Amino acid sequence: MTFAYKIDGNEVIFTLWAPYQKSVKLKVLEKGLYEMERDEKGYFTITLNNVKVRDRYKYVLDDASEIPDPASRYQPEGVHGPSQIIQESKEFNNETFLKKEDLIIYEIHVGTFTPEGTFEGVIRKLDYLKDLGITAIEIMPIAQFPGKRDWGYDGVYLYAVQNSYGGPEGFRKLVDEAHKKGLGVILDVVYNHVGPEGNYMVKLGPYFSQKYKTPWGLTFNFDDAESDEVRKFILENVEYWIKEYNVDGFRLDAVHAIIDTSPKHILEEIADVVHKYNRIVIAESDLNDPRVVNPKEKCGYNIDAQWVDDFHHSIHAYLTGERQGYYTDFGNLDDIVKSYKDVFVYDGKYSNFRRKTHGEPVGELDGCNFVVYIQNHDQVGNRGKGERIIKLVDRESYKIAAALYLLSPYIPMIFMGEEYGEENPFYFFSDFSDSKLIQGVREGRKKENGQDTDPQDESTFNASKLSWKIDEEIFSFYKILIKMRKELSIACDRRVNVVNGENWLIIKGREYFSLYVFSKSSIEVKYSGTLLLSSNNSFPQHIEEGKYEFDKGFALYKL
C-alpha cells in the first residue's frame, strides 16, 4: 500500500501525497516532530523506529496547521483528531464463498440496526439473519464520518472504520463472525464524493476535480492533471478493504456521479481489482445503462450487478398511488410487467420526469446482473416522514410486493426490518459540528425532501432505530419466500412468462407459477399446480386449468 504507513519489522514508513505543500512534518504525539522528505511527485516520506501500534500522529503543513492522515486507518477522536496506527492483518485468505447467483442481500445501517448501534450489535443478530435465509449483509458506509450519527455518505476518511461503530477491530470481528455463519459481507463505499466536514485533502493536492461537481460534496479527480495518484488512492482503498478486512464485495454509491473521461474508466479499474481477488462489485446507477454491467468485450465496465430503481418505482407507484417526483413516470401495471420482462421500464423511451429519452435495453444480460428491492435507505429515508411501505399500503399489498421481488429472477435486497414488518421510520440524520453546515442541512432537507424532523437532533436518529417488534406472520412469509426462491432455482433466469389482466399478474417459471391479484378479479388460469405459499387462505390447495374468482392476494404453485 502506498498511502498512510507500512509496518516493516521494527520500522514504520509513513507516506503522504501532498504536492501543494513545500514541506511537511510528522508529529507523533508524545514522541516528537520529524521533517519528512519530499520527492518530485509530491510524496512525503519518513521512516521511524521509535513508534508502535496505537501511537497517534498528525501532519504539520507549511502554514503550521495540523491535520490527520487522509489515508488514516483509524480516527479514534473523530474527523478532526489525530490518526492512530493500527495492527495490520497478519492473515489474508483470497478465497470467498459468495456467488452472485446465490445472493440474497440484507441492507444494514449499523447505527440504527440494534439498540447499541455497533458492530457487536450486528454480530448478535447474525443467527437471526442466517435463520431468515439471507446470504449476505450489505453494510452502509463505515468510512469515518463527523460525529456519531450519519447514514455514512458524509465519510471523509476512506480507509478508517467509524469509531462509534467499534473501529477496525469491531469490523474485523463482524466479518469473521459473519463468515463463520456462512454469510458474506458487502461493504457500501463512496467514491463519487467526500463529506463536507473534516476533509483536509483540499490543502494537500489535486485530489478533487475542478471540472465536475456533485450535489453532496467535492468529487474526485479521476481524469485531470495528476489524476494517476488519485486513482491509485481509490484503487488501493478497494484492495485495502479486501486484504485487511476480507470483505466479500462492494456496493458502489451513485456511480452516475462518477465522471471519468480517461481511456479506461475508473469503474472498470475498480472491477478489475475486485475480480482479481474473486470478489463481487455492485453499482448503484440511475442511468439505466447496461454498459455498467456489460463485459469488457461489449465495451462495458464489467461490474457484476447494478441496482434497478425502475423495478422499485413501478411497484411502489402502482401499490401506493403516489405520482409525485419520479413516480410521475410510473403507476401502471404494465410498468411492473415491463420491468419483469426487460429490467428497465425506461430503456430508450421518453421520461416525462426527466424530460428526455432515458435508458438503453439490457439485451441478453441475465437476472443476476441486477439488484431489486421494494425498500432501501434512499427510498425510505428520502421521504419527508421516512415512512416504510408498510405504512403506505394494506397488509395484502405488502405481501404481494414482497413476493414480486423475492421471487423475481433478479438479486433481491431486503432493507433491515422489512422482513418482519418494521413500522418505525428511517429518517435522514447527521451529527455535524459546523454551524453553517448544520443550518444548510436542515434547510436543504426541509426544502428538497419535506423533512420536518431535525436531522441534527439525536431524537431523529433514535426514532430511526429498529423496534424489533416482530410480526411473526410477516416474518414467516418472508422466510418461506426466500426458501422457495432457493428451492425453485429462480435466480438469474429471465425466461419467465408474464401474463396480466386489468388488476392481476400470472408469472410462470420453469417449475412454478405465481398469482398476483391486486383486487378481486376473475382470472383464466392456464396451468395446474399444488399450492406452496399464499398470502391468505382464499387460494385453493390444488388448482386446475379454468376460470376462478380470486380475492386480493398472492399464491405460489408448484407446476
UniProtKB/Swiss-Prot annotation:
Changing residue 253 to E: Abolishes enzyme activity. Pathway: Glycan biosynthesis; trehalose biosynthesis. One of its GO terms (cellular component) is cytoplasm. Keywords: Carbohydrate metabolism, Cytoplasm, Glycosidase, Hydrolase. Pfam families: Alpha-amyl_C (PF09071), Alpha-amylase (PF00128). Homodimer. This is Malto-oligosyltrehalose trehalohydrolase. It comes from Saccharolobus solfataricus.
